[in-house]
Amino acid sequence: MAKVMRLIIFVCVALVAISVPAASSVQSQQERIRPGFRQQLPSSIRPFSAFRRRGQEASDSVVYLNIVYLRLVGTRQCATGELTVVVHGKALNNATLGDVQTSLTRTFASSLKEPSSTLAIRRWSWKDPLFLMLTLNRRAVRTGTGLPRSTPLYQVAKQRLFVFVRKPTPTSSCRRAALDPRPLYGVPKVGVQDKYTLHVSMDVLGMSLREPLEHQEEEPGPASVSTYAAAQAILDGASSFGIGAFGSAKPNLKQISMYASGAELEKQVYTPTTSQLALFLPSKTFFGVEVTSVSDGTFRIPVSASRLVPFSAMSYMCTGSQTHKLTQTGMNVLEKRVHGKENPPSEGAEVLLNLLAARKPVNGVFEQDPTVVLLQLWRTPEGSESWQETPLMWEFPDTLEAIEDAGEYRSGILSSIAANTRIIGKMAGWLASRSFSRRFIRTLIRLNNIDLEEAFSMSDKDRRHSAADFRSVQEFFTRPINYHVYRDMDPRASIMAPADSLIQNIYTIRPDFKGEISHPIIPQVKSTSFNLREFLYGARQVPPLQLQSPSNRLFVSILYLAPSDYHRVHSPADWRVTSQTYIPGCTPSVSRRNLEAGDLLHRYERTALIGHWDPEKNGQQLFFSVTMVAAMFVGGLRLSWEEEPLGASMRLGRCTRYTESYEKQVDVELCASQEIGAFRFGSTVVMIFEAPEDFDMTSVGQCSHVAAGQPAGYLGQGRERPLQERCNAFRGNFESPFHFWKHLQKTSSVDDILKQNTLAPRAWRQEPGRVWAEVLRATERGLLYGFALSHYLLKRWATENGNLGELVLGQPEVLRQNINGSDSVIREGFRCFAAKDKKQIRLQMSGRQSQVSLTATVTPDEQFLFQHPFYGCVGDEKLGKLVRGIDATWILLPERAVLLTLKVSTGSKQEDGRVLRVATTKIEVQTEPCQGGWEESRVGTTSTTCAIRTVEKREESISEGVLTNGDL
């Protein structure tokens, strides 16, 4: 037995030794930023990765270094952290490890305050994980001496490196060898968002290659260089195009050579890659744009670089690129701005540089997703340089239905076994509905980073009113949330997102001259496609889809729900369902990976709801449909007006190409935000609807994550959605939860509408007025106690003078060069991280061009942030918890201090608990002047730490109303 155990240990060690060099190989940028289950596995449990074919190797101008470092956990204990260093340069073959060491010395200067301490780098060997695990908590840690600074960079580019603080003695305490991670808090993360990324330019920084003195690190001290000079070095050889004469009827865009000179260079617009943008605008919000046709302003955006919404055990996947087209207005604005004819920062300022890029939208509904921008670098007569950003309007180009046939369904033994999952799905569904499955709920929460604050938002201290007592995994996945409070909606929007999901595709289809959608095959993902008529109606023969006008368009949007998402589906618009068709089929996974592999949506089990809508309320009956597609282990789709799940009682055999569908004529009026169904696990929702040609669906984009109820489509020319009185029973008709609550108090008659929802508990529906009363109570409870982090910041944080915490600002130089010096948090860019000991929280805010990290202390009296049912800052250790209900803006003041403004809305009881008071408050956080050193850097990733000086809280608006439920 002992020999067998020794053999097993030897094999495991050998496999680990094989895997580490391969796992630390330089990955291409595309592989690095595409999150998948394999990429998230530690290299130690991917032993055969050495035999897998790698993607593109790093080009000669970019080298990726995987860095492991020590960080403090508590007062004495240490743990390891990881970061990626991206080294840019045109002659990296001559670069040495000392160049990177000099850059890291500047970043981690706060870790080298002790005399004779230096930053050392050595190779990370396969022994280190085990060695550090055994010695990290001891008084002495042997870290080694480090590699010589003259080591060529290419020799270590394919290896994992270990960075530590070196002392003259061969051994050191863990605390003294660890790096201070605070400078990284302002650094953007990429890919699966569990690694920080530092960008370094070898060409611009002018780093010294000389050997340092013994026991003393050489100070970096690069010569100060202007942003324009740095950009010229970075953009040398980048793609570009030229702008024609100003004032022409149509902008004359033309491709020009990178070696053009004279007047053409002054009108040149660069299209840098995401990697180039990351040097002088290091932000995860900016990404490259590839112009495909300069004549009509068509461009493509690599979605893998633009948006990722990851979570721990599995993730959304988006690859490929998406095509957009500048509108005529966008092209005119581009031409005028490039020629410097509009909005110069000051009189006499000249344009030095024009960049075409894209970024994520900020919070709100008034920016396109993605937001395409012209970035201009200006120089004033006094010699100062500043950035200016101008959004450019774009539109979806019409999809021409030129595809004649769909791809064949995959065949083969393995594909057949994988596709025939109906019996397995039923077994999994039966197990998930048993009470013993409840013990696995916490595991699912941890693996998928599920938002506990939302998941338990329907919990009530009186269990008679609670809808968050989950007796099985199935009940947890179909859980309700306090949708009326936790979702932002815009009553002006004609289309709202039907579910928490990732938008896999969104495009428009132009009909023929008769208004018919003549070809039934439409594109889906990459090279795959699906049959529109078969997808909606099954295999039966139906006439071509006829639009009301040849000038209208058919909009198609495919939305993917992951296991972490809220799994109820809400109506995206005010419309009428006239038929529902249940189409049996296969139930394999509908993940994007499978879609790209050839699985087609029209082969899947699904329920198609078909009807019509009148977006302008002028008597039209435009085609509208919402189709819910089942996923593996799902089946049994639940509709809010059906007592039993569809397909649950049907005796269906093996998964085959069914030639039969089950149609039912209905007459169901639905309102925007009204519940229409629920899934039992992850799946897909497909919206296909007819709308006027100028209908705007650009507020959300492909591969962006949307929340149920989020505005997704608007009528053109500023027209607003006509509100219907019958829809006043639902949140979608109101601007805020408070307005909805005030109306609900006066209209108990809407109970007749609300109790028709079969997803509500049966006991509530059987009691007259009960459903209305429970919706009213849940809304009051959410207004009073929702958004626990807002309550902590407003009522508990900084109430007494003392340690107010600190703030880390990422990219201060870029923010300083912004014309107004301000930035704001992007959509879904606000996250909360809690320390393991629950004594500190860190608020991470990602802006358009900079990042802010705010650290605050949590006392024992404030532990409600981590407790049931509030969970205000409970999430994955690396990914954090998404923060809702707080807006953030920040500005870099002339004295190099930061002013951070948080806007929160909280509720409280007044007058002996009879009055609900909802106040919107501004929290202004003023810091001391930030640490210096970053002013000399014009490229690369920089950050600075600022101590908080004062915290001021000022109420802006107050709304009050009488509580219906005084016992809350």
UniProtKB/Swiss-Prot annotation:
From the Swiss-Prot or TrEMBL record, state where the protein is found.
Parasitophorous vacuole; Cytoplasmic vesicle, Secretory vesicle
Positions bearing the site annotation: Cleavage (non-hydrolytic): 682-683
Q: Please list the residues that make up the active site.
A: 500 (charge relay system), 570 (charge relay system), 683 (charge relay system), 683 (schiff-base intermediate with substrate)
List residues, modification Pyruvic acid (Ser).
683
How this protein is processed and modified after translation, per its record? Answer: Is synthesized initially as an inactive proenzyme. Formation of the active enzyme involves a self-maturation process in which the active site pyruvoyl group is generated from an internal serine residue via an autocatalytic post-translational modification. Two non-identical subunits are generated from the proenzyme in this reaction, and the pyruvate is formed at the N-terminus of the alpha chain, which is derived from the carboxyl end of the proenzyme.
- Show the stretches that span the lipid bilayer: none
Note on how the cofactor is bound: Binds 1 pyruvoyl group covalently per subunit.
Catalysed reaction(s) here are: a 1,2-diacyl-sn-glycero-3-phospho-L-serine + H(+) = a 1,2-diacyl-sn-glycero-3-phosphoethanolamine + CO2
Record bears the keyword Lyase:
yes
User: Which keywords does UniProt give here?
Assistant: Cytoplasmic vesicle, Decarboxylase, Lipid biosynthesis, Lipid metabolism, Lyase, Phospholipid biosynthesis, Phospholipid metabolism, Pyruvate, Signal, Zymogen
Signal peptide bounds: 1-25
Pathway field? Phospholipid metabolism; phosphatidylethanolamine biosynthesis; phosphatidylethanolamine from CDP-diacylglycerol: step 2/2
One biological process term from GO is: phosphatidylethanolamine biosynthetic process
Taken from the record, one Pfam family name reads PS_Dcarbxylase
Gene Ontology CC entries for this record: mitochondrion; symbiont-containing vacuole; transport vesicle
Cofactors demanded by this protein: pyruvate
PANTHER family listed in its UniProt record: PHOSPHATIDYLSERINE DECARBOXYLASE, PHOSPHATIDYLSERINE DECARBOXYLASE PROENZYME, MITOCHONDRIAL
How is this protein organized at the quaternary level? Heterodimer of a large membrane-associated beta subunit and a small pyruvoyl-containing alpha subunit.
Q: What does this protein do?
A: Catalyzes the formation of phosphatidylethanolamine (PtdEtn) from phosphatidylserine (PtdSer). Plays a central role in phospholipid metabolism and in the interorganelle trafficking of phosphatidylserine. Can act on liposomal and host cell PtdSer.
Family label: Belongs to the phosphatidylserine decarboxylase family.
Full protein name: Phosphatidylserine decarboxylase 2 proenzyme
What organism, scientifically named, is this protein from?
A: Toxoplasma gondii (strain ATCC 50853 / GT1)
